[in-house]
């Protein structure tokens, strides 16, 4: 490969090439550093660029530094060193302005770039703005593809009357004929010469060579983002599945990896003509069932497009087995364990523990299926809880079996048999033919080269297809007019701001955070519709109602109906109890096939430590001005009057819940009550009884929102969080440190999280909550 590169470079030197291709309409050209400060408005990526030129036995150089919206250039010409500081910013998504200052000449220059279309760019630069002495006017077009750019520039000095004098015209052709291979030409009308340019892009670097009759130039650039890399053979890319994947990242102190970007990278990888296959190294990763199914479908699409997928794991489990179903081959470590074992859940029950302490937890609930408080008042599952959880696990298994059967092209009965007889040693798994071969980690490349009959295998990072980590080749920033705001509402619903748990890194859904996001979207004139992605077991009734109220104001305003914006809910793994409460008044509800929803019900709990105080010989005495002054004092067991009031408050909250569901879903109160009382429903059943409108994913919800907002069908949409990832989320540094420590000790993490969740019960309020968060898959 190195010999091939050196050969090509030697040919490039032979080409008669030249530099100084500074068309102000070319904002992200590899053929020029760019003298138009407006180019920094695109905030493409950081980088360092150096050029050295030999002209008439003299040597000149320049060094430029790009820091996003700002940059600097230091260059030497005619024995003089100059230093220029530049900056640019977007006025609109397609209009950019900029200015720079030359510290040696003490001159200010300004520039403009306007890209009305992705295939057209117009640029201008005025030198020495207070005493203008030179102007550049340029235009660029991309008639067929962003790999081919044609351009024209008019350049002229200016006299004292601001009139052009000795005008000159330049004509440009720049192309990337294949990934990372750059060829270009420039015609100088005044000199009547053609200048040729050529270069190579590597992952984070670029080499350009130029030479004309009088000069020769070489330049090298280093970039913070990934470039289209030069590679002649079709390549294999590498993906390591490790860590916690989630739909929304929470900034540099967040606890997870961006799942959306992973899926988008796979889709771009699938469409690329320069890729041959994907190698997946499965480490310790975790994600919800909805995310696992989405990843499985994305990998299946890659395989069905004709690309090879090799999945490697030391051990295996249910998640590995599903993902391997979408792979071409599953290779493993010989002495590993394939932990396929079905689906189950464990819920801790602590009534005897609390009794032994003398602590009494008084629970009032509506509906026999409202089982969230049972772990505090029972020693085992109630019949109703057992019925519901069994149904849930069987439905999860059914969806899982269907997916494995589809990917492996074997019968569902065979999949059930494999699950029923698990777990397995890897040797047993190979005998049963649901994995392929034994390979040590350092022999993966050797195995693939032998299987694919190729001489040598070099990997490229799948991150090349990650839009946030890749160089921006487009001439426009994404247009956000007629936008659809995607707001992620994830975790247990609490009052205040969202924040991460110090024990397991999970996010809680703060009403203040979600309401703020909704308000920003409602006021943003560019946002025409909102998609609320709900993944929550519920939580605080008060916090849930605050979010419901904010959605009501947006989707169903009382006064000015014209200000209404459609709100579409996309349910993830869970949207139950309070999670359903915040969804019920939206304009349309999508649930995924595995979504658990419903649990329309409410409960409340109070704590009494009267017997505990007796055990440790602490006596209490009291006085009050009124009969009920000591309501909810933990030192005493609740009186009959207090219990009656407590029950009445819970029943009032339940009536309010079903009334809002009835209004939002256009149902009768009795109808909602009959399917409520805490009962959970899988998505297909929820669709049949009217709790959701349709089975579909986040993309389906976005399309529906666009339709309700009357946005044209071909509008580009984004699944990135609005207004931005982590917006309004409180991330205490100590919580992050604590999570990093507890993540190494799963048992302590689980116990700590149970204690942490008790904060919900400490407030004087009612709860809408499930006893578990979601069925999570982990390696």
What are these regions (language model features)?
Residues 4-13:
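Sec-dependent N-terminal signal peptides
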Residues 37-41, 57-76, 80-126, 133-154, ...:
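Feature captures outer-membrane beta-barrel proteins of Gram-negative bacteria and organelles
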Residues 200-250, 344-346, 357, 362-369, ...:
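Hydrophobic targeting/anchoring helices
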Residues 225-347, 477-612:
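Cleft-lining beta-strand/loop regions that shape enzyme active-site pockets
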Residues 309, 347, 351-449, 560, ...:
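Charged, glycine-interspersed solvent-exposed loop segments at helix/strand-loop junctions
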Residues 403-407, 436-483, 603, 660-664, ...:
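C-terminal long alpha-helix characteristic of the crotonase
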Residues 479-520, 524-526, 649, 722-779:
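Intrinsic disorder and flexible/low-complexity segments
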């Amino acid at each position: 490969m190195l010999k091939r590169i050196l050969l090509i470079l030697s040919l490039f030197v032979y080409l008669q090439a030249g530099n100084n291709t500074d068309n102000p309409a070319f904002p992200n050209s590899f053929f020029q550093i760019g003298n138009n400060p407006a180019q920094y408005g695109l905030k493409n990526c950081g980088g360092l660029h150096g050029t050295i030129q030999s002209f008439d036995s003299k040597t000149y150089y320049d060094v430029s530094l790009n820091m996003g919206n700002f940059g600097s250039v230091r260059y030497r010409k005619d024995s003089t060193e100059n230093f220029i500081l530049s900056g640019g910013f977007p006025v609109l998504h397609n209009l950019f302005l900029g200015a720079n200052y030359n510290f040696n000449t003490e001159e200010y220059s300004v520039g403009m770039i306007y890209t009305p279309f992705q295939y057209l760019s117009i640029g201008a630069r005025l030198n020495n703005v207070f005493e203008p002495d030179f102007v550049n006017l340029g235009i660029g077009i991309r008639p067929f593809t962003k790999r081919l750019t044609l351009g024209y520039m008019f350049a002229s000095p200016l006299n004292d009357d601001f009139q052009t004098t000795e005008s000159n015209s330049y004509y440009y052709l720049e192309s990337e004929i294949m990934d990372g291979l750059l060829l270009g030409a420039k015609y100088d009308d005044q000199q009547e010469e053609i200048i040729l340019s050529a270069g190579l892009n590597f992952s984070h670097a670029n080499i350009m060579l130029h030479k004309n009759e009088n000069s020769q130039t070489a330049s090298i650039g280093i970039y913070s983002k990934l470039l289209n890399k030069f590679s002649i053979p079709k390549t294999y890319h590498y993906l390591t599945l490790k860590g916690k994947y989630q739909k929304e990242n929470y900034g540099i102190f967040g606890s997870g990896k961006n799942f959306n970007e992973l899926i988008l990278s796979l889709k771009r990888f699938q469409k690329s003509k320069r890729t041959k296959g994907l190698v997946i190294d499965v480490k310790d990763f975790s994600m919800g069932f909805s995310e696992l199914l989405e990843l499985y479908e994305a990998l299946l699409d890659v395989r069905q497009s004709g690309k090879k997928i090799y999945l490697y794991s030391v051990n295996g489990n249910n998640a590995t087995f599903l993902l391997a179903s979408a792979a071409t081959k599953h290779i493993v470590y010989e002495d590993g364990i394939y932990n396929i074992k079905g689906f189950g859940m464990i819920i801790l029950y602590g009534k005897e523990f609390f009794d032994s302490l003398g602590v009494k937890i008084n629970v009032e609930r509506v509906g026999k299926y409202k089982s969230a408080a049972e772990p505090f008042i029972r020693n085992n599952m109630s019949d109703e809880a057992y019925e519901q959880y069994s149904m849930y696990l069987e439905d999860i298994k059914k969806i899982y079996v269907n997916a494995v059967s589809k990917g492996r092209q074997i019968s569902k009965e065979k999949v059930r048999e494999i699950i029923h007889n698990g777990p397995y040693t890897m040797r047993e798994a190979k005998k049963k033919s649901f994995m392929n071969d034994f390979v040590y980690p350092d022999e993966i490349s050797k195995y693939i080269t032998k299987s694919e009959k190729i001489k040598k295998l070099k990997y490229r990072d799948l991150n090349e297809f990650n839009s946030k980590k890749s160089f921006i080749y487009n001439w426009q920033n994404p247009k956000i007019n007629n936008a659809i705001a995607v707001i992620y509402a994830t975790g247990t619903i609490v009052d205040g701001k969202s924040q991460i748990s110090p024990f397991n890194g999970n996010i809680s859904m703060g009403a203040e955070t979600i309401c703020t996001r909704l308000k920003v979207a409602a006021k943003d004139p560019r946002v025409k519709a909102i998609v609320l992605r709900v993944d929550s077991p519920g939580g605080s009734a008060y916090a849930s109602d605050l979010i419901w109220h904010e959605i009501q104001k947006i989707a169903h305003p009382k006064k000015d109906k014209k200000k209404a914006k459609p709100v579409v809910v996309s349910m993830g793994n869970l949207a139950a109890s309070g999670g359903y409460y915040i969804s019920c008044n939206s304009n349309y509800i999508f649930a995924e096939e595995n979504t658990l929803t419903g649990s329309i019900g409410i409960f409340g709990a109070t704590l009494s430590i009267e017997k505990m105080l007796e055990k440790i010989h602490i006596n209490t005495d009291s006085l009050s001005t009124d009969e009920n002054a000591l309501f909810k004092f933990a030192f005493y067991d609740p009186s009959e009057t207090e219990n009656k009031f407590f029950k009445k408050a819970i029943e009032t909250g339940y009536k309010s819940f079903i009334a809002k569901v009835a209004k939002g879903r256009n149902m009768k109160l009795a109808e909602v009550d009959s399917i409520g009382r805490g009962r959970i429903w899988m998505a297909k059943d929820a669709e049949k009884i009217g709790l959701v409108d349709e089975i579909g994913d986040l993309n389906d919800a976005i399309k529906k929102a666009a339709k309700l907002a009357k946005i044209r069908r071909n509008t580009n949409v984004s699944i990135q969080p609005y207004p931005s990832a982590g917006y309004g989320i409180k991330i205490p540094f100590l919580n992050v440190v604590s999570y990093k420590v507890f993540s190494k000790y799963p048992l302590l993490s689980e116990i700590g999280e149970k204690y942490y969740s008790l904060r919900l019960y400490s407030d004087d309020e009612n709860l809408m909550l499930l006893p578990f968060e979601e069925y999570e898959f982990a390696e």
